[in-house]
Amino acid sequence: MSKSKMIVRTKFIDRACHWTVVICFFLVALSGISFFFPTLQWLTQTFGTPQMGRILHPFFGIAIFVALMFMFVRFVHHNIPDKKDIPWLLNIVEVLKGNEHKVADVGKYNAGQKMMFWSIMSMIFVLLVTGVIIWRPYFAQYFPMQVVRYSLLIHAAAGIILIHAILIHMYMAFWVKGSIKGMIEGKVSRRWAKKHHPRWYREIEKAEAKKESEEGI
């Protein structure tokens, strides 16, 4: 039986969740930036009006948190750091040259992707906690003013860090040819998988061989 040239990397439900986060994050990031930079208040028009921006910003933030927690449960087992990540980190120059397949035996996600995963998850947790504390008119009145002020600063810092992390994530997605297509269509070529994630590709081949054996092909 001939093998398909394409293999599934990301299931539909995970892709749908990912792009939902992308859309919501775009809206929340723009409105959040406008709150701290008055000259950019026009960015709140992404929600229609400045008033609607302030009202909807936290609700969309909650939506992002829920979606990311779903993704956390789905992907955390693939993002546990281990000693096999060390060669990737030690040879980062070669990785940036596109030679990661020569220096590291990468699984489904490389060390950089794992760091991105934990950065995003930790920042969204900080944003949730501080966001609830500063959320008027629902929760802010239950906290001392000093706590609200510090939470506002921490919320802003976490937001800036997360925005930068997402920008790096976007850049890397464009830099590694085939990544975006894989997240849109859910499939990548065997050649792509073998080059960028050889250990994961071997696991796929092993699973395919086992399935064929069980089916008596």
Curated annotation (Swiss-Prot):
The protein's superkingdom reads: Bacteria
User: Which Gene Ontology BP annotations are present?
Assistant: anaerobic electron transport chain; anaerobic respiration; formate oxidation; heme oxidation
Q: Which is an annotated GO molecular function term of this record?
A: formate dehydrogenase (NAD+) activity
UniProt topological domain (Periplasmic) ranges: 37-52, 135-150
What residues does a menaquinone bind to?
169
Q: Where in the cell is it found?
A: Cell inner membrane
- The stretches that face the Cytoplasmic side, renumbered to this chain, are 1-11, 75-110, 176-217
Stated role:
Formate dehydrogenase allows E.coli to use formate as major electron donor during anaerobic respiration, when nitrate is used as electron acceptor. Subunit gamma is the cytochrome b556 component of the formate dehydrogenase-N, and also contains a menaquinone reduction site that receives electrons from the beta subunit (FdnH), through its hemes. Formate dehydrogenase-N is part of a system that generates proton motive force, together with the dissimilatory nitrate reductase (Nar).
Q: State the name under which the record lists this protein.
A: Formate dehydrogenase, nitrate-inducible, cytochrome b556(Fdn) subunit
For this protein's source organism, the top of the classification is: Bacteria, Pseudomonadati, Pseudomonadota, Gammaproteobacteria, Enterobacterales
